Amino acid sequence: MAKFIFVTGGVVSGLGKGITASSIGALLKASGLKVFMQKFDPYLNVDPGTMSPYQHGEVFVTKDGGETDLDLGHYERFIDEELTKLSSTTSGKIYLSVIKGERKGDTSGKTIQVVPHITDAIKNKVYQAAKQSQADVIISEIGGTVGDIESQPFIEAIRQIRLEQGKENVMFVHVVLLLWLAASKEYKTKPIQNSVKAMASLGIQPDVIVCRSDSSSPKDIKEKISLFCNVPITNIIDAIDQDSIYRVPLALAKQNLQDIIIEQLQLKANAIDLTSWKQFNKKIDSSSQEIEISFVGKYIELQDAYLSVLESLKIAGWEFNKKIKIRWIQAETLNESNYNEILKNSQGILVPGGFGKRGIEGMMLASRYARDNDIPYLGICLGMQIATISIARDLLNWTDADSTEFNKNTTHPIFDYIKGIDRDNIGGTLRLGTMVTKLEKDSLVSKLYNSDVALERHRHRYEFNNKYKKDLESVGLRFSGIYEEKNLVEVIEMPSLKFFVASQFHPEFTSRPNKPTPLFKGFIKAIIENNK
């Protein structure tokens, strides 16, 4: 039978509940336990797929095509497991399923209420995750902050799960902010006390309190929190600011958080083995020389919009003992008169995914600069599309070459809507999830993957128009990755250049500590070799 850990947050949002939950998962996995993780978001969107990156940040795609919260990227990277749609649930998804059931007559004419119908649906998601994953431990993060009106059904649901399963099977971890007042030079615990009281008023007593701060809390402060919050002092854990999120598991392990959990939940675990985490942290420590990458995107004002791309770059850099320095370039600012000057010191150029017309002309100029100057280039999703269109415009002189996403009247639609995709609804209608890409023999990408196939995740609704394949091949473009089932182009490269590679899929979703995705590893290696 699975055990359950629920991670909640108090005082303020944005404390790093996701990193805390991920670190707990990493510690339990390092103790020989099978872990499954999930996130409950209180917002009423069915999923984040239609939300603006400026509102939500990155949409992380699971192997089965779930469009999910960016915290799932942290979960997968920390526990090195592929999660599923079951790992992401929103209030919108819960309410929609309950209302659909009522409309179909599944509720036998009963009055539909938050308790029990909504709370039962939430509990079913937790129990379903336990049944399908067959994990030893299910770790569920509750989004938002205790006291938020939107979170109350989730808090009530996990209270009921504790009642149903017992304290030896359910654990509550509460992440809070420990305030430091610089003026009076003292810590203030009252916000923590009030947060725990708010939890208690909803029927939940935290078993562990994780205190976020920029330094370790003194013993007397821990004693005070312990006394007023009714939590043993051994279960008051410091989570201080780190220069890398990948140091957090080791920091929590030093405070024996895994032992506290294993003891309360009566888990049969092995002695913890943190060898891989220690080795990874040594790579971080030994990385000194910087590599500067020009990151040409359209959502750069909110870096969380590209979270997995950034983490993938860091992980690949550390593999070569290099630090990654990002030079953020808003694609809209690039034009014919300034792009050479702005991009002239680029060691590598990356154009990530995105939707819509804004900024694409600047992205094409970045792609052109990489081609003309033989600078390592990596394009992802939209970054592949604009690279291909740019080649059609510059090398075939098709000046109006475009995607029908940007220009429905183009006479050279290099990219067009995927056949069979719903054109009327944008939610959940993209090509999503892991697909098998067949890699051409002796291509650069096949050498990077050391395989004739790549398993990567997708999120797009436009595809390359095979009508123009021979024309583009005639000017040196190689179509080196194909989804054979539907003959869709997945990877392009320019063999005449040192590293000019772009993929329709998103390789950033499969990067892991100590295991960088081949495209990112190859990109960083090419930059290093190009700058010797």
Swiss-Prot record:
Active site: 381, 506, 508
Region forming the signal peptide: none
One Gene Ontology CC term in the entry: cytosol
Protein name per the record: CTP synthase
Recorded name of the encoding gene: pyrG
Family membership: Belongs to the CTP synthase family.
Extra remark beyond the main annotation: CTPSs have evolved a hybrid strategy for distinguishing between UTP and CTP. The overlapping regions of the product feedback inhibitory and substrate sites recognize a common feature in both compounds, the triphosphate moiety. To differentiate isosteric substrate and product pyrimidine rings, an additional pocket far from the expected kinase/ligase catalytic site, specifically recognizes the cytosine and ribose portions of the product inhibitor.
Residues reported to bind UTP: 13, 188-193, 224
Annotated Glutamine amidotransferase type-1 domain residues: 292-532
Pathway: Pyrimidine metabolism; CTP biosynthesis via de novo pathway; CTP from UDP: step 2/2
Binding site for Mg(2+): 71, 141
Protein source organism: Mycoplasma capricolum subsp. capricolum (strain California kid / ATCC 27343 / NCTC 10154)
GO biological process, one term: 'de novo' CTP biosynthetic process
Function text: Catalyzes the ATP-dependent amination of UTP to CTP with either L-glutamine or ammonia as the source of nitrogen. Regulates intracellular CTP levels through interactions with the four ribonucleotide triphosphates.
